[in-house]
Amino acid sequence: AFLSAAVSNATNPNAVNEKVFSAELGYGYRSSWLNVNLNAYYTRWMDKTMTKGGDILDENSNPVDRYSINMQGVDARHMGVELDFVAEPTRWLTINGMLSVGDWQWDSNATGYYYNGQGQPLADLKGTIASDIYAPDHAKSEVQLKGVKVGDSAQLTGALGATVKFLDGFRAGLDYNFYANNYADFALNGSSLVVGGVKTFKDPWKIPSGGQFDFNASYRFKIGSCKATLYGNINNVFNQEYIVNATDADGTWQNAYGVFLSLIHISEPTRLAL
């Protein structure tokens, strides 16, 4: 693995292959009007490599370069259950839904070594170059992640929707999507890192839950001998605003940054399929 493929051919001499173990168990039910699937999963990633970065500042606190901390031996454990169903109680009504409940967390601590923007080993966060990669003066930190929730993805999601068929060729549907148990991704910065020391993370900021309604409609018809379908979609019908992901370093919303909000509804252009 190259340390900085854009500017250097230096490779990570301690890089190892990532390993994945996964197991699933599922059950399905089928009837004339109802289909249900239930699934349980367990996945473990081992020896992941992760990189976080920040600015190297001069004496006036102006950025002069970028540093990265290359962490090895990072494990993660994802487990949960998933349920989905499709019901058609009448020929003109279809109801569908899903529920996913997960428990995802980092499962190990990691040691990270520092490099500058050119992939050179750093002796400190002031930009001093170390004598060699993994030399005694090569700056490193231990990052304690074990038990910290994995961020940037909701661990509890649900959806419920209904589609109505009416007249001849018309179809309209409304779906609600719900997101919860979403955590901000952990962050490293120069003020919180101690070269040669330990950086301990607690549970990151838990992002408030959110959801939105989406509307869709279609009409099937013929143009001569050709079959055509006219589609239309309106996402986030009621202009709900909620946080999708964020980054923080201390587990509080006050210091969260990189926050991304769901936007006001987007109406997709009408499409004609022939």
Question: Where on the chain are the PLM-derived regions?
Answer:
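Solvent-exposed loop segments that connect transmembrane elements
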Residues: 1-12, 50-70, 107-146, 184-203, ...
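Membrane-embedded beta-barrel scaffold of Gram-negative outer-membrane proteins
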Residues: 14-69, 77-79, 105, 230
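Residues that define the transmembrane beta-barrel architecture of outer-membrane proteins
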Residues: 19-23, 30-32, 75-79, 154-158, ...
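Residues on the lipid-exposed face of transmembrane beta-strands in outer-membrane beta-barrel proteins
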Residues: 25-29, 81-87, 97, 160-164, ...
